[in-house]
Amino acid sequence: MLTDVIMCTYELIDKCTKEIEKEDKQMRDQALALIIKEAKKSVFDGWTDWRYNLLKSGICLCDEKSAKKLEKVLDTLLEISREDYFPEYTKKEDLIVRYLLHRHLYGKENTQKELYQNILINELRIIAIKDAMEEKNYDEAEKLCLEKANAENTWHYRSGDPEDWNNVLYDIYKTANNREKQIAQAKKLLLMGNEKFWGVLKQIYRECGAWNENYESLLDELKDSKRTVCYRSVLISENEKKRLLEDVMENPYDLFYYGKYLVKEYPEQIYELCYKEISESCAQAKDRREYKKITKNIVQLIKWKGNDTAKSLIEELKQRYPRKPALLDELEKVEKKL
């Protein structure tokens, strides 16, 4: 994808500027001038984040004198943005770049006030949290993180994003070696659907010698959380087939995926579920494309050695829908495989 190409390009630019940072002032100034020249081009109009990301890559090349050139460009871009539909977005990017520039020039201690003045900007809050953790000020890191984590609804949670506030909060507790809060946060993330934290909790509880006593109750809580995919993935990993069958019977969601884990031990129950699910799907189907999906499931039933169930099902569907020639045609194709 184009975005991947762009991101790889920016990574390469960052690597180059980090190397040029070690060279003499003349080379650093030339590289910075080139970055500024490119960032000013109209090709970046409408792509504010890419423009400012390019400028960020030039920060490491700056000394106090050359930094004035970069800030002059920032001033110009900020002035132009007043005519945009969303000038506040440019303002945010501007504040981030200026802070990173000042931090580069004067150090984190001398720019802490500027950092906290703009703490509502997520990117800067993350920096403040990392600074606090480096200083082992875990209470401050927790406070900064909780202010955001508590303000967001659980459906905002992005399990795969390491900078999601709830993920950051877990990392804080882990780094601080706060076992009690670590367990509580790991459980919260599991019940929000992050399957990874089942393994995390398993390891922590085993280290405490408390895994067996917490195992069943943790499964019950996960079931009650209604995070079906997460719950079933955990059941599969723990080989909890009886629980998995009960859950699939309560809700046959994705039956033809989960059935493969159950059909060997519970063939009759799975065949019965397949019969019912296919019958109900057929009642809703209206064209050949949907009929093909139905017959694909019948083929799967046959692969699971449910031939007798498949025969009965095909006969019933043929009798129930004699005026659906496309369906009858697809059923006949499957019937030949019996």
Regions found by a protein language model. Give the residues of each.
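Eukaryote-biased, non-catalytic alpha-solenoid scaffold regions
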Residues: M1-L338
